[in-house]
From Swiss-Prot:
It catalyses: RNA(n) + a ribonucleoside 5'-triphosphate = RNA(n+1) + diphosphate. One of its GO terms (cellular component) is virion component. Residues 686-894 form the RdRp catalytic domain. Its EC number is 2.7.7.48. GO terms for molecular function: nucleotide binding; RNA binding; RNA-directed RNA polymerase activity. This is RNA-directed RNA polymerase P1. It is found in: Virion; Host cytoplasm. Keywords: Host cytoplasm, Nucleotide-binding, Nucleotidyltransferase, RNA-directed RNA polymerase, Transferase, Viral RNA replication, Virion.
Length: 1458
């Protein structure tokens, strides 16, 4: 695509997309489809397209995948050339060449880096891999020429950008060496604590290649060059063609240099596959990182455009930092350290010349404009059962000058001056000038815009990856030494004695008090399970969020074909182990280093172990099990932070904690039914301090601190400890468990059962009582040894502290932090002048925030005294705290990744749009892209830019990435291949008779699939407005014909391999239950399983089999429950209700296994591949037959029509609290009002708490959706005695009488709303969560004709219309409107009668009631004869016609606060 094509075809269409209002939305979307089609053709080569006459939005697009080297190389050279031309298009030469000298210096530095073989041991073990040359430029050039001159099959194993099949290439060839002077390769020694010699050898070339691949790969889901092209295109459109990227200029000059003037060689030496994977890096080590820097930098400029508005100074600062990073790709940590304290103490200096000027000075806005909350008092502690914001108004003045002077102390000034000097020392003069702007107080959003802009520069490196072993050792070794010194201090007045004197009794008392409250029934809804309940409900303890439990891999022979299968399902892991998950006999209580373990073996045993290791008969994980060692995993973060360790817990320890302390965790999660009595956690009283009590996914959790920052009357004190887990000693944790044990011992019945865990070494009584389980776990946690492994290097670490994979990590960290905070508050009150009083506090694991009434604070000495008290106390309690990071501020703060300033809230721009932290676990490309859609949605809702632009950007990227690979043998090759390549392809296919070659094609589903809702198989559900995913109503009202034109095709996109393997496995394990096989449809479309071999990364896993899980589940069935369930099933049959066998209680073991197998994923390369028959079928369908019916997937939307009425008289001057939102989000907040009061408990599509509680209480695997479907499809409610029928139904699947009665009452009391996939609307999790979305507030934007419909149904329509209004507001350039809902009268009568159980109360409201539609004039009368009575005197017949889903209202009842 030439620059002229982009300028003449793409630019105007994108402008029309972004500037058109509602009246032009259809044409705008057609333009979007055309742009996508053009970009896809450009990406794949229009001459490679098959059936190019087809409508791409109806049938999709098919391309031959290029595999011939020269053709592929030329195409990529063309893509890069187009990118460079686009960058230079209509840009002055002076602008283009402005930084050429610097860029030339960067390229020269790369090509003069030390050679790979010159790296010494210190280099290769450094945290960040040093820069080095992989080969000389001459060697690279010669290799490229040689590579392109060889036949496609002449080099075995060479990677290819299009990932073509290389498995059958000729072996008799010479491999091209992509590293210069391989003869200089040498052996390097890696530390290995699992080796008898404590070291292992590998080659230098292998090790650095592995590190390069592991640490540089951004894990994209698409190739970066099209992403660069799209990003630059949008930047050009927004700036009228002026945008210019010096990152792309660097790419251009580099490609010109290394190609030596040959256009076909002018491609970037970091090679990516079409799926975004980094395939190889040539010539120089850090090219992949530089590609990441360039793409991320351009993306931040585009998506956070409102922070800079493309002003010259900001763009110059951006370019300066980008060029610095390109020159110093490992320099991100230095840059981050240079501005660390500026990031904490920005906007803190009161400057009368600027702060009170109320005007713009040197381009900086000093107007005073932020929300204030006058209703909030800080004279007494704030003790409330639920945190929420109070009403706000605009603040235009500043009146806390004395407090300003106290906070901005000499110490703080020195911090800031030092950071500015560090930036200057990095030779970044423009950034230095920018940071100087961040010092003075600015009570408006502009300072937040500036701090976020600076943080985008810190985050352009994406996810940081480094040498895990080096990073772990850098922290763990020093802290282990510190801990050992602490533990060895036995003096009476020592640090250990002082802490144990006050903390351990408090820990024990808290553990005792909370346990006692739970056992006495004071914590409503929380209880200790019996031993039998624990086993029956094992699924509730092993959830997807059970960190630290190993994953499962297995090899499956299905129909003679071997599949490598993986699953991250914790349930699958449990099912493979069976009852062994409760057996502690295999867990060593004396973990050892290997060297220590060997001393316990005699010579013969040592030799046997040596031989087994040498012959690979014993794997690493088995050796770790023998030594009692656990595994350390890792996770990456952004902003160049070191990799963090994740300590993997063994399953037995996890379950023991679930039984012991799980109820405590449950007692501190969610709103407390008993209001707190005081600030502090005592055990008997939970207090107000646990963040988990108030967390709802919004900033409500710290609303009091945010409001206080606008008052000018309070101080926020923020404690930031480093490596909290490693300094939280096990010795400090055990007293809490001892308190639990004491309470359980006193409460005799709680310790009367002995089957929680097993110890097979005890011959008399195998089972363990709960107190015995506590003793075992306390002994277990005293000392562990964890082993970290990275690219062949392995280190074992002694751990006598909290480890991150434990169930109780967050809870116990919060407990200790709360106790320390209480102690600090007492000390501040008693020792600091003026006795400042704490009015509110909160802890979230290792984060703590305290808010003090500052009326008595007049000097910096008082502030410094508070800081010293905080630092001294945490230090005395064995934690590491940096005084410089202990922020005390009257206007700003950061806690648990929530930032605030002067009553305004914002987020760090750390979410990455392009990169992934980990390799996707999705089973197919549709799931991958749906995951990307969710990431893009999350990214865009906090990006300070245009939501319309950013949403379009995400859709364009997804359109190019959403492709399916299809391979077929040559005799199935696609017809209609272009003649230009036909003869060449035929020649290649016949060149070597002994090789089976393939025709490989790439299929793009209909382009409308990107916005097609996910209720359609191939739909991604991406957002048009940015408000929500799956925008069904908007599509229905504005774009229905376009989306439905190819809907039938989109709904046939499927991936069979995973399903075939999982179903075949299920049939294998059900081979003795032919009735279940037939009912589940496993008798067709499956293949015989010949063999299964299990493996796991968990040290507790020595062997496994799903047969173990089935046996364990069958044994755990309660005989009494089984009898009840069978009786209920028989009663249901007697009235004609037949339940699917898989849902009955007696078949629960099999349904559990079935659920485990649904999450398996087979060979990675198949996740993007489908069978050729499907694509042939899709292509053969006439366009006229591709049309589908979207509303049939979402039938609720067929009940009504929405009409928009423009309304310009709405109030639009509400103050703005949420700054990290797009421009449209702030406009909506100004229109609707900021989030205020208690909002409804919206968690999206999920479940009514009563139904979820029933499922969890009974350990069921059925989902809430399936349970409701079962209630509906069984017809149990539409017969006589519907309540009793439901009791029998729930008893048949659970065997539990009490919970079945409770759930039946819940249903019949009309509390649930029928769930189906009809409503896909989210308030929480979208930018609308920032607005006051209470029904009393939003009703002014909605009108509904049928005003006498039941209140809950009216609420549903109100919220649908409200979201639709917000979508229209965004797409119509922030034009306010009102949405008028008219009900479809033909369906209203059936809907009202059939949507729910009809109680007597509802009957009284319904009989003879007239429902009228003001527009149509139609009146519907419902008389008593239309409702037949039943034998149940309380309820009437329900004839289910249509299930209704209202997920976001499920916690509401009439009259509840909105």
């Amino acid at each position: 695509m030439s620059g002229a094509d982009v300028e003449s075809y793409i630019f105007p269409r994108i402008r029309e997309i972004l500037t058109g209002g509602i009246s032009g939305i259809r044409e705008a979307y057609i333009n979007e489809l055309r742009v996508c089609e053009k970009l896809i053709q450009w990406r794949n080569g229009s001459d490679n397209q098959v059936d190019s006459t087809n409508d791409a939005s109806v049938k999709g697009m098919v391309f031959h995948r290029v595999s011939e080297r020269n053709e592929l190389q030329n195409r990529y050279a063309g893509l890069y050339d187009d990118l460079f031309k686009l960058n230079n298009n209509n840009v002055d030469i002076d602008v283009i060449t402005k930084h050429d000298e610097t860029i030339d210096k960067i390229i020269s530095k790369e090509l003069k880096s030390k050679m790979w073989y010159e790296l010494n041991d210190e280099d290769i073990h450094s945290s960040l891999l040093p820069e080095f040359q992989i080969q000389t430029l001459d060697d690279y050039y010669d290799n490229m020429k040689k590579y392109l001159s060889q036949d496609d099959r002449d080099e075995k194993g060479n990677d290819n950008r299009e990932e073509e099949d290389v498995k059958n290439r000729n072996d008799n060839v010479t491999r091209i060496q992509w590293q210069t002077l391989m003869e200089k390769d040498r052996k390097v020694k890696l530390h290995d604590d699992l080796s008898f010699s404590n070291e292992v050898e590998t080659s230098l070339s292998t090790y650095i290649n592995l590190r390069t691949k592991e640490e540089m790969d951004p894990r994209y889901v698409y190739h970066p060059v099209p992403a660069l092209f799209i990003t630059l295109t949008l930047l050009k459109v927004l700036t009228g063609g002026k945008a210019f990227s010096y990152g792309v200029r660097y790419l251009e000059k580099l490609c010109k240099t290394i190609s030596k003037g040959e256009r076909s060689l002018a491609t970037y030496p970091a090679i990516f596959g079409s799926n975004g994977e980094l395939v190889a890096t040539r010539l120089y080590s850090h090219y992949a990182i530089k590609m990441r820097l360039i793409l991320n930098n351009m993306t931040y400029l585009l998506t956070y455009k409102s922070c800079h508005e493309f002003k010259d100074f900001y763009i110059d600062v951006n370019d300066e930092v980008l060029l610095y990073m390109l020159e110093n790709p490992n320099g991100g940590r230095d840059l981050k350290k240079a501005v660390t304290r500026l990031n904490l103490y920005y906007g803190l200096r009161y400057n009368p010349k600027t702060t009170d000027s109320l005007k713009i000075i040197d381009g900086v806005d000093y107007h005073h404009e932020h929300p204030k909350y006058s209703d909030r008092s800080y004279d007494a502690p704030i003790i409330e059962p639920e945190n929420h914001f109070s009403a706000s108004e605009q603040c235009y003045e500043h009146n806390a000058k004395l407090l300003n002077q106290a906070v901005y102390s000499k110490t703080v000034k020195e911090y800031i001056d030092s950071d500015i000097k560090k930036v200057k020392d990095l030779n970044l003069p423009l950034l230095t000038k920018f940071t100087e702007k961040l010092v003075d107080m600015r009570c408006n959003k502009s300072i937040i815009y500036d701090i976020v802009f600076m943080r985008t520069l810190l985050n352009m490196g994406g996810y940081s990856r480094s040498n895990q072993i080096t990073d772990f050792k850098g922290t763990i070794d020093d802290i282990t030494k510190m801990n050992d010194e602490y533990l060895s201090d036995v003096s009476e007045g020592g640090k250990r004695a002082k802490m144990s004197e006050w903390m351990y009794p408090k820990m024990e008392a808290c553990g005792y008090g909370l346990t006692k409250s739970i056992l006495n029934g004071q914590m409503v809804g929380v209880s200790y399970p019996s031993a039998s309940e624990s086993k029956a409900h094992i699924e509730s303890y092993i959830t997807p969020n059970s960190a630290g439990i190993g994953n499962l891999r297995f090899d499956v022979d299905v129909g003679g074909k071997m599949y490598k299968v993986r699953t991250t399902s914790k349930s699958a892991f449990v099912n493979a182990l069976g009852t062994n998950i409760f057996n502690i006999d295999t867990i060593s209580m004396e973990p050892m280093f290997l060297s220590e373990y060997l001393t316990h073996l005699n010579q013969d045993e040592k030799m046997l172990l040596y031989d087994r290791r040498k012959n690979r008969q014993i794997q690493d994980i088995e050796l770790m099990r023998l030594c009692g060692q656990n595994v350390i995993g890792s996770r990456s973060t952004t902003a160049w932070r070191p990799v963090r360790p994740i300590y993997i817990n063994v399953i037995q320890a996890h379950l023991a904690q679930a039984f012991i302390i799980g109820p405590h965790i449950n007692a501190t999660v969610g709103r407390q039914r008993t209001p707190p009595k005081g600030l502090w956690f005592t055990g008997e009283d939970v207090g107000i301090g646990f963040a988990t009590i108030y967390q709802n996914g919004t900033s409500d959790v710290i609303s009091h601190a945010i409001e206080a920052s606008a008052s000018g009357r309070c101080l926020s004190v923020l404690a930031d400890c480093s490596s909290w887990d490693q300094t939280f000693l096990t010795e400090s944790i055990i007293p809490y468990y001892q308190g639990i044990k004491r309470a359980i011992s006193e409460f005799g019945q709680a310790d009367s059962e002995n089957y929680y865990m097993y110890d097979n070494q005890r011959k008399d009584v195998v089972g363990m009582r709960l107190t015995e389980t506590i003793d075992w776990f306390n002994e277990y946690q005293k000392k562990r040894i964890f082993n970290a492994s990275y690219l062949g290097e392995r280190y074992s670490f002694k751990v006598q502290y909290m480890w991150s994979g434990r169930l109780d990590t967050f809870f116990m960290n919060s407990v200790q932090n709360a106790l320390i905070t209480e102690r600090i508050a007492n000390q501040v009150s008693s020792s600091v002048a003026g006795s400042p009083s704490l009015v509110w506090f909160q802890v979230a694991g290792d984060d703590a925030i305290m808010v003090y009434n500052a009326n008595s604070i007049t000097s910096s000495d008082q502030v410094d005294a508070i800081r010293k008290t905080v630092v001294d106390e945490y230090t005395a309690d064995n934690h590491i705290i940096n005084p410089q990071k202990t922020v005390i501020s009257h206007i700003s703060g950061e806690y648990a990744k929530i930032y605030y300033y002067a009553g305004m809230h914002f987020r760090d721009p750390s979410i990455q749009l392009h990169e992934s932290e980990k390799i996707s676990k999705a089973t197919n490309i549709t799931e991958v892209m749906r995951g990307y859609a969710q990431v893009a949605f999350e990214y865009n809702k906090r990006a300070i830019g245009s939501l319309r632009i950013n949403s379009l950007y995400a859709r364009l990227l997804a359109s190019l990435a959403y492709s399916i690979n299809v391979k077929r043998s040559d005799d199935e090759s696609i017809e209609n291949k272009p003649n230009r390549r036909g003869s060449k392809a035929k020649a290649r296919s016949t060149k070597t008779n002994n090789l089976r070659s393939f025709s490989s094609v790439k299929y793009y589903p209909p382009l409308t699939s990107v916005i097609t809702p996910t209720g359609v198989k191939g739909g991604l559900g991406m957002s048009l407005s940015g408000i929500s995913l799956n925008e069904i109503l908007m599509i229905k009202e504005l774009l229905l014909d376009l989306v439905e034109a190819g809907l039938k095709i989109v709904d046939q996109v499927s991936f069979e391999q995973n399903e075939i393997v999982s179903k075949s496995l299920m049939r294998h394990f059900l081979r003795d239950r032919k009735d279940l096989i037939k009912e589940m449809g496993l008798d067709k479309g499956t293949k015989p399983v010949m063999a299964v071999r299990y493996r796991s990364s968990d040290s507790a896993f020595s062997s496994g089999n799903f047969e173990n899980g089935i046996s364990m589940r069958l044994e755990s069935l309660d005989s009494h429950k089984l009898s009840i369930a069978r009786q209920s099933e028989a009663k249901l049959k007697s009235v004609g209700v037949n339940l699917p066998k898989m849902y009955t209680y007696e078949n629960l073991p099999y349904s559990t296994i079935n659920q485990s197998l649904k999450g398996i994923t087979i060979d990675k390369d198949l996740s993007r591949m489908t069978n050729s028959d499907l694509v042939d079928q899709l292509r053969s369908i006439p366009e006229s037959e591709c049309k589908g019916n979207l509303i049939s997937k979402y039938p609720v939307y067929g009940l009504f029509n929405a009409r928009r009425i423009i309304s310009m008289d709405e109030k639009v001057d509400n103050p703005i609290r949420y700054i990290s939102t797009p421009d449209e989000g702030k406009a909506l907040e100004r229109l609707i009002g900021s989030r205020t009061g208690i909002q409804f408990k919206n968690q999206g599509y999920g479940g009514s708490p009563a139904i979820v509680r029933f499922i969890r209480r009974n350990g069921l695997t059925i989902t809430e959706e399936n349970l409701i479907d079962l209630v509906i499809s069984s017809g149990a409610i539409s017969l006589a005695n519907p309540k009793q029928n439901m009791i029998e139904l729930f008893q048949a699947i659970s065997g539990d009488q009490q919970s079945s009665l409770e759930l039946a009452n819940f249903f019949m009391n009309e509390k649930p709303h029928w769930e189906d996939k009809a409503i896909s609307i989210t308030i929480n999790g979208s930018i609308l969560e920032n607005c006051d979305s209470r029904i009393s507030n939003i009703s002014r934007f909605v009108s509904i004709d049928a005003i006498r419909i039941p209140g809950d149904i009216k609420k549903m329509f109100t919220y649908i219309a409200y979201v639709y209004m917000c979508q229209m507001f965004i797409l119509d350039e922030n034009t306010p409107s009102k949405i008028h809902i008219s009900i479809n009268e033909e369906q209203l009568r059936d809907f009202l009668i059939s949507a729910k159980p009809i109680s007597k109360n509802r009957m009284k409201q319904t009989i003879d009631m007239k429902f009228s539609n003001q527009n149509s004039g139609v009146t519907i009368e419902i008389d008593e004869e239309s409702l037949s009575r039943t034998a149940d005197l309380d309820y009437e017949v329900l004839k289910l016609v249509h299930p209704l889903s209202v997920p976001f209202l499920r916690n509401l009842s009439e009259g509840s606060p909105m």
